Amino acid sequence: MEDLKEDIKFIVDETLDFGGLSPSDSHEEEDITVLVSPEKPLRRGLSHRSNPNAVAPALQGVRFSLGPLSPEKLEEILDEANRLAAQLEECALKDSENAAAGPGRPSPRGKPSPRRETFVLKDSPVRDLLPTVSSWSAPPPSNLTGLRSSDKKGSARAGRVTAGKKPSSIKKESPTCNLFSASKNPGRSPLAQPTLPPRRKTGSGARTVASPPIPVRPAPQSSASNSQCSSWLQGAAAKSSSRLPFPSAIPKPAIRMPLTGRSIPAGKGALAPDPLPTQKGHPSTVGHRAPVSQRTNLPTIGAARGRTSSAARGRVQPLRKAAVPGPTR
């Protein structure tokens, strides 16, 4: 119990020494001896000064003096300081040599930030290894927009020109020459099929009259071709005129027929057949008379012309059945 009481010390009981720099204190420390034993190790508190050069105490009971450094330790410290100074001088010499070799190289002390570093490659030997971009190959963005607009305009104009022009391989042929080619290839040409010119109505009735053939103007070509084309056209017109007088047997719609006092209304049916042809017995061009069903539906000229006399009705021949060509494609 007594040992524990001796180990415990309060702050009030301790005496603090604040005059560590006074020379008198260093002389007093020479007389202080510390006993070290394995049972009670060295106690260091605020009231005791520690020696950094003190060696760890051994287990054996040996006395250590807390005094100034021994001359041997002072020599060791001096040698260590000299070595450090020599190393610092060598480092300084190396830095000065590097600065003399490269004057453009910035010093390590005043090194700027890496973002502000610039590199000039005009006189550098590495410039040939880097990719080069010529000034004319990279136009400014304003020129790029102008080039794009001009390209679009040029393509649009080219499209218009090609659409407006016909291919040069196709030769312009006159209609007369087409007629000659049609005569050579009757199967392929549209003129191979017999076509009749349009008919027109004359007078108050619905009598169909063949219109005269329309003359075709030949294209300006050589005199020989013009003479051949004209002679061929005249021959074709003569043939067509000889075949045209036969009226068509196709009944016209009743709505287009003019309504007269003697004619039958269109809604009740077809016009009444004329009995005169059956009495006189005029033969038809085809060689057969029209059947009864068709004779009732065929519009007669006498019924269409309500104002003509009975004598004129006897003179007029009935409509005859004629072959009508199909629509040409």
From Swiss-Prot:
- The species this protein was found in: Rattus norvegicus (Rat)
Record PTM Phosphoserine, positions in chain: S22, S47, S65, S70, S124, S189
List every position bearing Phosphothreonine.
T145
Q: Where is the composition biased (Low complexity)?
A: 219-231, 302-315
The question of whether Thylakoid is a record keyword is answered with no
The major lineage groups are:
Eukaryota, Metazoa, Chordata, Craniata, Vertebrata
Q: What is the annotated localization of this protein?
A: Cytoplasm; Cytoplasm, Cytoskeleton, Spindle; Cytoplasm, Cytoskeleton, Spindle pole
Q: Which InterPro entries match?
A: DDA3/GTSE-1, GTSE1_N
Gene name as annotated = Psrc1
Residues folding into a coiled coil are: 70-94
One annotated GO molecular function = microtubule binding
Gene Ontology cellular component list: cytoplasm; cytosol; microtubule cytoskeleton; midbody; spindle; spindle microtubule; spindle pole
Concerning Pfam families, the annotation shows: GTSE1_N (PF15259)
Q: Where are the sequence repeats?
A: 38-41, 68-71, 103-106, 194-197, 212-215
The job of this chain, per UniProt, is described as:
Required for normal progression through mitosis. Required for normal congress of chromosomes at the metaphase plate, and for normal rate of chromosomal segregation during anaphase. Plays a role in the regulation of mitotic spindle dynamics. Increases the rate of turnover of microtubules on metaphase spindles, and contributes to the generation of normal tension across sister kinetochores. Recruits KIF2A and ANKRD53 to the mitotic spindle and spindle poles. May participate in p53/TP53-regulated growth suppression.
Name of the molecule in the record: Proline/serine-rich coiled-coil protein 1
GO BP terms: namely: cell division; microtubule bundle formation; mitotic metaphase chromosome alignment; negative regulation of cell growth; positive regulation of DNA-templated transcription; positive regulation of microtubule polymerization; regulation of mitotic spindle organization
Subunit-level organization: Interacts with APC2. Interacts with KIF2A. Interacts with ANKRD53; recruits ANKRD53 to the spindle during mitosis.
Q: Does the keyword section mention Cell cycle?
A: yes
List the keywords (alphabetical). Answer: Cell cycle, Cell division, Coiled coil, Cytoplasm, Cytoskeleton, Mitosis, Phosphoprotein, Repeat
Region annotation (Disordered) ranges: 94-329
Q: Where is the composition biased (Polar residues)?
A: 132-148, 175-186
